[in-house]
Curated annotation (Swiss-Prot):
<dbReference type="InterPro" id="IPR037034">
    <property type="entry name" value="RNA_pol_Rpb2_2_sf"/>
</dbReference>
<dbReference type="InterPro" id="IPR019462">
    <property type="entry name" value="DNA-dir_RNA_pol_bsu_external_1"/>
</dbReference>
<dbReference type="Pfam" id="PF04561">
    <property type="entry name" value="RNA_pol_Rpb2_2"/>
</dbReference>
<dbReference type="InterPro" id="IPR007645">
    <property type="entry name" value="RNA_pol_Rpb2_3"/>
</dbReference>
<dbReference type="GO" id="GO:0006351">
    <property type="term" value="P:DNA-templated transcription"/>
</dbReference>
<dbReference type="InterPro" id="IPR042107">
    <property type="entry name" value="DNA-dir_RNA_pol_bsu_ext_1_sf"/>
</dbReference>
<keyword id="KW-0808">Transferase</keyword>
<dbReference type="GO" id="GO:0003899">
    <property type="term" value="F:DNA-directed RNA polymerase activity"/>
</dbReference>
<dbReference type="GO" id="GO:0000428">
    <property type="term" value="C:DNA-directed RNA polymerase complex"/>
</dbReference>
<dbReference type="Pfam" id="PF04560">
    <property type="entry name" value="RNA_pol_Rpb2_7"/>
</dbReference>
<comment type="function">
    <text>DNA-dependent RNA polymerase catalyzes the transcription of DNA into RNA using the four ribonucleoside triphosphates as substrates.</text>
</comment>
<keyword id="KW-0240">DNA-directed RNA polymerase</keyword>
<dbReference type="InterPro" id="IPR010243">
    <property type="entry name" value="RNA_pol_bsu_bac"/>
</dbReference>
<dbReference type="InterPro" id="IPR037033">
    <property type="entry name" value="DNA-dir_RNAP_su2_hyb_sf"/>
</dbReference>
<dbReference type="InterPro" id="IPR007120">
    <property type="entry name" value="DNA-dir_RNAP_su2_dom"/>
</dbReference>
<dbReference type="GO" id="GO:0032549">
    <property type="term" value="F:ribonucleoside binding"/>
</dbReference>
<dbReference type="InterPro" id="IPR007644">
    <property type="entry name" value="RNA_pol_bsu_protrusion"/>
</dbReference>
């Protein structure tokens, strides 16, 4: 299958897919960090005599302490030390001290766009937030009168909101406080009435506000402003002045940001330079002018979900914000030290304490919502994670508050954010993925490329023009799949275009731009689905998401039917090794490749072998070149996990039949052939990490040793002399991986032992076995052991003397309960594995590999899978692979059907087998029952489908509990496999048993099997001794409920029903109270206090005796 049939060569090669991460971090190092340091320079003390300047332009970064691989091995952070030249000026005596100061460690991005924090690869997700700028909105009140408002949102600082009301008055709110007349604010800014009215297009509208407020001076306006913003404090003119200055005109407190200034200038047609990041009176006047014009139907209101009003904050900017937080804290410390210390002995090093900055950066990488543990299940998952856009996180939205509008697909998403790929569930629409050709510009807006069109001719020979959503709005843009002739002229009289957020049609000569590619609108994961245009969007969404969950298999196989993007996706994920130069391969083995370059030196490429990924899948690289091969720069020389020949290979091509089989594929279940198990078609390797540390305890150090008490020699035979398992040993659940003993405390010892110790001293010192064992349900082969000790100079957690890590690999064959899926959202669980001889077989005797339910197709509307399976069948018969770019109608109507039909006919002609394609039943063939050899009663669709095995493996989910831990308060068993929990018997299950009247089973479930503490101990005892199970007692949760009601002062008690009896006066005696709290088990709370009334009668001076 070496030759490739490519129908549509990609018209435009994709840009580097991880560039968004790298470019942003590069910007941070080159500009962002310098910008922040300079904004804090100089720092002066309170008297103004001492100044500390940061000479940020010359800052230095030291070589990282560890390489990337070494940092992963040692669980360290891959980072560099930052040094900034500083100058301390003492104005009293004119002394100047220059020094390089260490300001902290900065984690460094690897060339794959990730960070290594404490040995784990992490990704900083891009955040999509509302852009700073001015936004105009209209609202209709209950009388149908329309009012407008404008919000001036800065990057940081106070919000300013202007609004009109039904009486045509103008109001302003500062930071959502009380309303204030706009005239007061403008006067407080020092503008005269004539200046204000001259600047407005409709001064008569503003005049109403002036008349309502009356005439007043700037001083009166400032006092009024102060009263409104600081009610309760004595107002002063200087106070008002200072308040206004600090709120809007102090660059430290108020910052529009470069973007905010750019958006303001664009919206209000101002010419204020980019460097002015604070508000100016000009801005405020222009904003009010625009607001008044809206009342006269001039100008437009803004749509906050439009991508021209939302921008992307990538790593660099998020990190810059965090550095600002750290520098703010640092500035305070430096000021204090300047004041406290002796001025003569001051040096920059003694002033600058790197701790606050280090803490801020650590906090960001370690615990920010946007710093995520990288999804490393397969190369596609890794790539998608780096291109993710999240609306959540600090300064973003929250799941609960986000409405429908924010989540919805917006016309401006076209070519920028994928309309398909988003999670199902509460995050739907809040987390998206960057489209294939999209890029982020310097202001953080997403741009996408278009070819210009001149007089109906697409200029494909010119470089495409990148446009933001704002720039594109007033252009007529045709989609990427419009048909053109060989000269580039658009065919047809009517062309579908997008114009001003609307889908309309126009003539070819009216078109301004054409999209560069049909896959431009979707993300990388979605663009890997062939025949995407035949799938319902909901299923395409599942298909995109499930491709990211495919487990890398032992022998990857690239798809027979692909889309042509597989190679680029594999390349940019960083899993494959690319040659850096032209040259000749001089040496190859499993661990390294050496390439002799044309100009002399030899480059060695080291391969990753069987490394554990973040998701416990296996990372492994294999060479695909031979000695003597000539390689070009950028050529793939080694495959990674889930790639073959430099292309993404997430699953396997297998023979599938769409037919029911004995009900085993009811409700999306899947029936598979034993061949898939025997031939390791769907076998994957998983590597689990187990770790143990020997700590220093109060009673002495823990020891890693082979001398484990009360353990047979058999259990220790795989351990070396230090008590650590040998590499290559096969281990099962319960086996010791590392022997460890912990000193026992005095209290643990019986008296006779204490006596022995008193006589013989330390000799009889006792230890407890605390070894690391293989957990339940796990087994495998030990592939690596790493030992870290203080003596070797390793950095260990506090209190630990030694850390041992053991890596156990297991081969997992496919089995019943595993989840499989195709690329079209067709997912299912394996219900049965059938012997090969029982599987339905084709006329040439070939058994099918997998039987799917045909009812899974019509209602789900993912017909793409049928096209894929039939074209795959043609490809398998012809020995070819196909690349079909989605949206192929540009080559003619019904092109998918035509292509598949033609290829099937060709397959029949080439093979000479008529059954391969039957024109009477196109796409179907006679299939025989493997059990009887009889043909089934009707033809069946059979073909080659590309199926994935997903990471939801039954081995990781199956779980059983006999006895285990209980919750502290309710005493019920915990939940979940990790806690060794039980199965919840919820209210609906209880109803089911009630409906059947199964009283005793129900009673056991609610008492001895759950939280009747005494009863469950007795029941266990009875089972062990073979006696009958005693009567259950009261559940603990009922007692908790009683206690809670008592804590609300409700006197609730349980009484024993008895035969009514009367006292001497003929009154009925109360039923005797049963104290549920008196319990034989030791951990009991004290009994409830009761008041002894007889004691009160005897003595009047006692206030009230309480007996317990």
């Amino acid at each position: 299958m070496a030759s490739n049939q490519i129908y549509t060569p990609p018209a435009f090669t994709l840009p580097d897919l991880v560039e968004i991460q790298r470019a942003s971090f590069r910007w941070f190092l080159e500009e962002g960090l310098i910008e922040e340091l300079e904004s804090f320079s100089p720092i002066t003390d309170y008297t103004g005599k001492i100044e500390l300047h940061f000479l940020a332009k010359d800052y230095r970064l030291k070589e990282p302490k560890y390489s990337v691989d070494e940092a992963k091995r040692r669980d360290a952070t891959y980072s560099m030390q930052m040094y900034v030249p500083t100058r301390l000026i003492n104005k009293e005596n004119g002394n100047i001290i220059d020094q390089d100061v260490f300001i902290g460690d900065l984690p460094l991005m690897t060339d794959r766009g990730t960070f290594i924090i404490n040995g784990a690869e992490r990704v900083i997700v891009n955040q999509i937030v509302r852009s700073p700028g001015v936004y105009y909105k209209s609202e209709t009140d209950k009388n149908g009168r329309r009012t407008y408002n404008a919000s001036l949102i800065p990057n940081r600082g106070a919000w300013l909101k202007f609004e009109t009301d039904k009486n045509d008055l103008l109001w302003v709110r500062i930071d959502k406080t009380r309303k204030l007349s706009a005239h007061v604010l403008l006067k407080a800014l020092g503008l005269t009435d004539s200046e204000i009215l001259e600047r407005l297009r409709h001064p008569e509208y503003y005049q109403k506000t002036v008349e309502k407020e009356g005439k007043f001076s700037e001083e009166e306006a400032l006092i009024e402003l102060y009263k409104k913003l600081r009610p309760g404090e004595p107002p002063t003119v200087s106070g008002g002045q200072q308040l206004l200055e600090s709120r809007f005109f102090d660059p430290k407190r108020y910052d529009l940001g470069r973007v905010g200034r750019y958006k303001l200038n664009r919206k209000l047609q101002l010419n204020i330079p980019d460097s002015v990041r604070i508000l100016t009176p000009e801005d405020i006047l222009a904003a009010i002018d625009y607001l008044i014009n809206l009342e006269f139907d001039l100008g437009t209101i803004d749509d906050i979900d439009h991508l021209g009003n939302r921008r992307v904050r990538s790593v660099g900017e998020l990190l810059q914000n965090q550095v600002r937080v750290g520098l703010n804290r640092l500035e305070r410390i430096i000021r204090e030290r300047m004041t406290v210390s002796d001025t003569d002995s001051l040096t920059p090093t003694s002033l600058v304490n790197p701790k606050p900055l280090v803490a801020a950066i650590k906090e960001f990488f370690g615990s920010s919502q946007l710093s995520q543990f990288m999804d490393q299940t397969n190369p596609l998952a890794e790539l998608t994670h780096k291109r993710r856009l999240s609306a959540l996180g600090p300064g973003g939205l929250t799941r609960e508050r986000a409405g429908f509008a924010v989540r919805d697909i917006h016309p401006s998403h076209y070519g920028r954010i994928c309309p398909i790929e988003t999670p199902e569930g509460p995050n739907a629409g809040l987390i998206g993925s960057l489209a294939t050709h999209a890029r982020v510009n310097e202001y953080g807006f997403i741009e996408t490329p278009f070819y210009p069109v001149k007089d109906g001719r697409v200029l494909k020979d010119q470089p495409p023009i990148y446009m933001t959503a704002d720039e594109e709005d007033d252009k007529r843009v045709a989609p990427g799949d419009v048909p053109t002739d060989e000269n580039g002229y658009i065919l047809g009289d009517v062309v579908p275009v997008r114009y001003r957020q609307d889908f309309t049609t126009t003539t070819p000569d009216q078109v301004d731009y054409v999209a560069v590619s049909p896959v431009q609108i979707i993300s990388v994961a979605t663009s890997l689905i062939p025949f995407l245009e035949h799938d319902d969007a909901n299923r395409a969404l599942m298909g995109s998401n499930m491709q990211r969950q495919a487990v890398p298999l032992l022998r990857p196989q690239r798809p027979l039917v692909g889309t042509g993007l597989e190679a680029q996706a594999a390349r940019d994920s960083g899993m494959v090794i690319l040659s850096q130069t032209n040259g000749v391969v001089s040496y190859v083995d499993a661990n390294q490749i050496r390439v002799k370059t044309d100009n002399g030196p030899e480059i060695t490429y080291t391969l990753q072998k069987y490394q554990r990924s973040n998701q416990d899948t296996c990372l492994n690289q294999r060479p695909i070149v031979f000695v003597g091969d000539r390689v070009q720069a950028g050529q793939v020389i080694a495959d990674g996990s889930a790639t073959e020949g430099g292309e993404l290979a997430l699953g396997q091509n297998i023979l599938v039949a769409y037919m029911p089989w004995e009900g085993y594929n009811y409700e999306d279940a899947i029936l598979i052939s034993e061949r898939l198990v025997q031939e390791d078609v769907y076998t994957s390797i998983h590597i689990e990490k187990y770790e143990i540390e020997a700590r220093q305890t109060k009673l002495g150090p823990e020891e890693i040793t082979r001398e484990v008490p009360n353990v047979s020699e058999e259990a220790l035979r795989q351990l070396d002399e230090n008590g650590i398992i040998r590499i290559g040993a096969f281990v099962e659940a319960g086996d010791i991986l590392v022997g460890k003993v912990t000193p026992k405390g005095e209290s643990d010892q019986p008296p006779e032992e204490k006596l022995l110790r008193a006589i013989f001293g330390e000799k009889a010192r006792d230890v407890r076995d605390n070894s690391l064992r293989v957990p339940n349900g796990e087994k495998g082969r030990v592939v690596d052991v790493r030992v870290f000790t203080r003596e070797q100079g390793d950095e260990l957690p506090p209190g630990a003397n030694m850390v041992v890590r053991v890596y156990v690999a297991q081969k997992r064959k496919i089995q019943v309960g595993d989840k499989m899926a195709g690329r079209h959202g067709n997912k299912g669980i394996i219900s049965r594995i059938l012997p090969v001889e029982d599987m339905p077989f084709l006329p040439d005797g070939r058994p099918v590999d997998i039987v799917l339910n045909p009812l899974g197709v019509p209602s789900r509307m993912n017909v793409g899978q049928v096209y894929e399976c039939l074209l795959g069948w043609a490809g398998a018969c012809l020995g070819r692979r196909f690349k079909i770019t989605p949206f192929d109608e540009m080559h003619g109507k019904e092109k998918s059907r035509e292509t598949v039909h033609a290829k099937l006919q060709e397959a029949r002609d080439v093979t000479g087998q008529d059954w391969v394609f039957n024109p009477e039943n196109p796409g179907k063939m006679v299939v025989y029952d493997g059990r009887t050899g009889e043909p089934f009663d009707r033809p069946v669709t059979v073909g080659m489908a590309y199926m994935l095995k997903l990471v939801h493996l039954v081995d990781d989910k199956i779980h059983a509990r006999s006895t285990g831990p209980y919750s502290l308060v309710t005493q019920q068993p915990l939940g979940g496999k990790a806690q060794q929990g039980g199965q919840r018997f919820g209210e609906m299950e209880v109803w089911a048993l009630e409906a059947y009247g199964a009283a005793y089973i129900l009673q056991e479930l609610l008492t001895v099997k759950s939280d009747d503490m005494q009863g469950r101990n007795e029941a266990l005892n009875a089972i062990v001794k073979g006696q009958s199970i005693p009567r259950p007692g009261t559940p603990e949760s009922f007692k908790v409920l009683m206690r809670e009601l008592q804590s609300l002062c409700l006197d609730i008690s349980v009484r024993k029903a008895s035969i009514p009896s009367f006292d001497d006066d003929g009154e009925m005696k109360p039923d005797p109270e049963v104290d549920l709290m008196v319990d034989v088990s030791p951990r009991r709370t004290p009994a409830r206090p009761t008041i002894d009334y007889s004691a009160l009668d005897d003595t009047d001076d006692k206030e009230g005796a309480t007996t317990f």
